[in-house]
Curated annotation (Swiss-Prot):
Keywords: Cytoplasm, Methyltransferase, rRNA processing, S-adenosyl-L-methionine, Transferase. Pfam families: Methyltransf_5. InterPro entries: RsmH, SAM-dep_MeTrfase_MraW_recog, SAM-dependent_MTases_sf. Belongs to the methyltransferase superfamily. RsmH family. GO terms for molecular function: rRNA (cytosine-N4-)-methyltransferase activity. This is Ribosomal RNA small subunit methyltransferase H. Residues 322-342 are annotated as: Disordered. It catalyses: cytidine(1402) in 16S rRNA + S-adenosyl-L-methionine = N(4)-methylcytidine(1402) in 16S rRNA + S-adenosyl-L-homocysteine + H(+). Its EC number is 2.1.1.199. It is found in: Cytoplasm. It comes from Hyphomonas neptunium (strain ATCC 15444).
Amino acid sequence: MSLRTTPRSPAEPGHLPVMLAEVLTALAPADGEVIVDGTFGGGGYTTAILKAANCTVLGIDRDLDAIVRAEKMAQANPRLVPLLGCFGDLDTLAEQAGHASVDGVVLDIGVSSFQIDQADRGFSFMKDGPLDMRMGGSGPSAADVVNTMSEKGLADVIFRLGEEKNSRRIARVLVQRRVQAPFETTADLAAVVEEAVGGRRGARSHPATLTFQAIRMYVNDELGELARGLRAAERILKPGGRLVVVTFHSLEDRLVKQWLRERAGAVPGGSRHMPLMSKGPAPAFELQENKAVQPSEKEVETNPRARSAKLRAAIRTNADAALDEASDGMNLPPLAELEKSR
């Protein structure tokens, strides 16, 4: 499951900010600046940013528990401004807080350790709890998805977001089982998925890992939120502003990589046989590195959850922000359809 290793409080054992040194280097906070931490979590990045410079941090999270932590931290450090909401709306949230532009944005994508560790949030099959998985607590839950979505819809979600090769078989078994009794707990779902794929057979990870990941990503529209967050950052960043994104899943990294390449002026379609007729719009970003930065071997030894992390960073130019609409490219059934059926 795409675990955001962090969330991220250096003060709490087991919650380590991933690639903290690399994030600070790419973000380069300076005195007097305004930085957006779009995924506040446990405040690990925010704490380090506030220590690195006499700046203001807008700590955004859609999880109310995270905002409660942020508000407690803000009592001791008024340079932190907690903002409840989705990072896909970070430009609107920043403007509502009185900041028409900002100097830096950092996004740490995925579910947090705090969320995983709370059984009642329903994110993990390691701790039995209600089948929920909602980061923000509103909208259709994982139980709604599993109990009402069509077999084809479930198979598509599990295959595209989980990259699970047994997606059709799993979807078929889930639909057959829910006729007898609806799914209500994480342990129940995990057991049925394990049975559907034939048990563990010595596998390093639980057979339900990819299915849980897919359903969680769908429930929270994580790729759509990421696409919206990137565009919001483009709109709110000043020229010279830094965008830093840490991902833990290949789908997330692919989306960030392709979007940054396009925004940095890499227009697809040209070749030496058929040159481009137009160079496209002026680049809105300059890449800090051509390739993703990965955690050091030492960090992975200390924090194994950091193993899959990739960091991509770019600097905003003075070009106008693009006006295209955000898309995750998955073409999955919209959550709104489930909302209507509830």
